[in-house]
Amino acid sequence: MPTPITTATVQPLQSLPSAEEVIGHWDWSPALGTLHEWIQSQGIHASQVVVLVPFAQMMSQATAAWGQAFPTSFVPRFETTRNWAGAAGGPAIQADDLTLDVAHDSVVAAAMLASVKIRGLDAHWRRTLAPQLVETAHELATLVASVHPDARSDWLAERLAVLNLGSGDGFQRWESLIGTMALTWAANSQYPTDVLWHPVLHPSVAALAAIPGLADDPLTSALLAHWPNVKRLPPLAVRTAENGSPNPARLLAADDAQTEAQMAAARVIAHLQAGRVPVGI
């Protein structure tokens, strides 16, 4: 019996998105206008300026917005800290470094706990404490990465001074142990973004600027305080597709946590369906 021939419907080619669709629902004018004036006042070539943005999706949006606003100008490098570090080539990660990969870090945490010899720390407690060690270390990673690598030893010593290893009774004893181990692990690890702390490694970058996000990013703030030539730009405002004006804030009341979660999910879905991305939660 001959094999039946399957057919597929050929979809027509879609047109390329317009500049407005690429730029998204952000009002880039204040931030990019300030950036353009600052670059000119500094006498810097625009292509030698790295501009940190909060989300990876904003890199292409910022580039499109700059091209629309300043079509005859060279374009700055719009990057996230992670993307910039990846392009620069970060340090080689060691086997026991904190990587924020749960599978890898769980193995390291189990090995760390296995090496600790404290009365009462048996196999059961090691299995119980390993996930907590990983979670605590992950919570510290963002903060530690915002500390200059050369200053992390002093940073660690200051924080260990307020912890008394093995103090207290019951679970407080294990909390102290986990806190000490997580601090030590996080502070002694290398991070991909560590390469950003050394301007000498970036000869093509003459200046650093940043557009703030919904919340302060510790690493971005620390880099702006460390690099010699920097500029903090105004935050972005959200605009509607209809009139380009910022969306007014809305406050919704919920009777309980379940209703609150459902309302929040509905609002996020509505924003995504309207093409407003990314959505900050």
Predicted region positions:
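Basic/charged alpha-beta structural segments of nucleotide/phosphate-handling enzymes
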Residues: 2-11, 53-203, 218
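Helicase P-loop NTPase motor core
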Residues: 2-51, 55-56, 241-281
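Conserved beta-strand termini and adjacent loop/short-helix elements that scaffold enzyme active sites
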Residues: 23-26, 79-84, 235-238, 254
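Short amphipathic alpha-helical segments and helix-helix/interface helices
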Residues: 36, 40, 197-200, 220-225
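Beta-sheet entry/capping signal
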Residues: 48-50, 75-77, 205-209, 230-231, ...
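Alpha-helical scaffold elements adjacent to nucleotide-binding pockets in ATP/GTP-utilizing enzyme cores
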Residues: 61-65, 87, 222-226, 263, ...
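Short, surface-exposed basic-aromatic patches at helix termini and helix-loop junctions that form
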Residues: 65-72, 225-229, 273
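Conserved RecA-like helicase ATPase core segment
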Residues: 140, 203-257, 266-270
